[in-house]
Swiss-Prot record:
Tetrapolymerization of the monopyrrole PBG into the hydroxymethylbilane pre-uroporphyrinogen in several discrete steps. Pathway: Porphyrin-containing compound metabolism; protoporphyrin-IX biosynthesis; coproporphyrinogen-III from 5-aminolevulinate: step 2/4. It comes from Marinobacter nauticus (strain ATCC 700491 / DSM 11845 / VT8) (Marinobacter aquaeolei). The keyword Electron transport does not apply. GO terms for cellular component: cytoplasm. Its cofactor is dipyrromethane. Gene3D superfamilies: Periplasmic binding protein-like II, Porphobilinogen deaminase, C-terminal domain. This is Porphobilinogen deaminase. The modification S-(dipyrrolylmethanemethyl)cysteine is found at C242. Binds 1 dipyrromethane group covalently. The porphobilinogen subunits are added to the dipyrromethane group.
């Protein structure tokens, strides 16, 4: 069989390149007849670093240009952090695999303090996420939360320069880049419920390319797919993007029972709406939609309306 060259569209950040290299290595390990190249692309989210993501329209900021590369034939597939993947895909493209989830937690990183409880009143904490900000403010209303944009190395450099007393970012990204030692501890999900899909990698490609779909299929992790699909169903009903104070985290309690927790928070932390439920794993998406409806009826609709400018329909 002749060799097929697959081209992965990827952002140029260290973390995005790590993720793309990981998928490249897996594809080449699984298939002797495949060579993989990386196509580096700058996205809108990479170009605008001085404005909070939520202000520039948080949906798809890190994927649109990658999708254009697949649609016009420059690339065959793209690797995404699942927490960045929009709910809707352009015609002809789709999410075809979710790899086994790594650490889904948020990490507390500080050069002076071992634990968030040790932060003095008024301490400055950096994060780029409204979800993290809402939960931080709910737990520690005395803290100053400041926007922290940029890639992982940039964020750590800003902490080291003394601009922040602590920063909070995804544990998985730090670990993938070898920064295990920078994590003081991982925030428990009771303190900071993770983002939809956090810690998992997704693969998007042209859905009509059956040969490519067969090559990618072994990378799909069924347990992770079912968990993240339930989380995304909740998020879809709430019209959430990656820059909205929505959290959802699903666990498999046994082979068949899915436990899903969801949260919507006012960014100032004064209101946090929480729901949870269980269902057979095959009904995870239904559970996600039902829990989203519960959140809306509890008052999350008003919180989200302030952010979106309209109530989720």
């Amino acid at each position: 069989m002749s060799k097929r060259t697959l081209r992965i569209a990827t952002r140029s950040s260290a973390l995005a390149l790590w993720q793309a290299e990981f998928i490249k290595a897996e594809l080449e390990r699984l298939h002797d007849n495949v060579d993989v190249e990386l196509i580096k692309i700058k996205t809108q989210g990479d170009k605008i670093l001085d404005v909070p993501l939520a202000k520039i329209g948080g949906k798809g900021l890190f994927v649109k240009e990658l999708e254009e590369a697949m649609l016009d034939g420059r690339a065959d597939l793209a690797v995404h952090s699942m927490k960045d993947v929009p709910m809707e895909f352009p015609e002809g493209l789709g999410l075809v695999a979710i790899c086994e989830r790594e650490d889904p937690t948020d990490a507390f990183v500080s050069n002076q303090y071992e634990h968030i409880d040790q932060l003095p009143e008024g301490a400055v904490v950096g994060t780029a996420s409204l979800r993290r900000e809402a939960q931080l403010r709910a737990n520690r209303p005395d803290l100053q939360i400041k926007v922290l944009r940029g890639n992982v190395n940039t964020r750590l450099a800003k902490l080291d320069a003394g601009e922040y007393d602590a920063i909070v970012l995804a544990s998985s990204g730090l670990k993938r880049l070898g920064f295990h030692d920078r994590i003081r501890y991982c925030l428990p999900d009771t303190f900071s419920l993770p983002a939809v899909g956090q810690g998992a990698l997704g693969i998007e490609c042209r859905v009509g390319d059956t040969e490519l779909l067969e090559l990618i299929d072994p990378l799909n992790h069924t347990d992770t797919w079912d968990r993240v699909s339930a989380e995304r169903a909740l998020n879809r009903r709430l019209e959430g993007g990656c820059q909205v104070p929505i959290a959802a985290y699903a666990l498999l309690e046994d082979d068949n029972t899915l436990w899903l927790r969801g949260l919507v928070g006012a960014v100032d932390g004064t209101q946090i709406f929480r729901v949870e439920g269980r269902a057979p794993r095959a009904e995870g998406e239904r559970l996600g939609r039902e829990l989203a409806e519960q959140l809306l009826s509890m008052g999350a609709d008003k919180v989200l309306a302030e952010i979106y400018g309209h109530t989720p329909r």
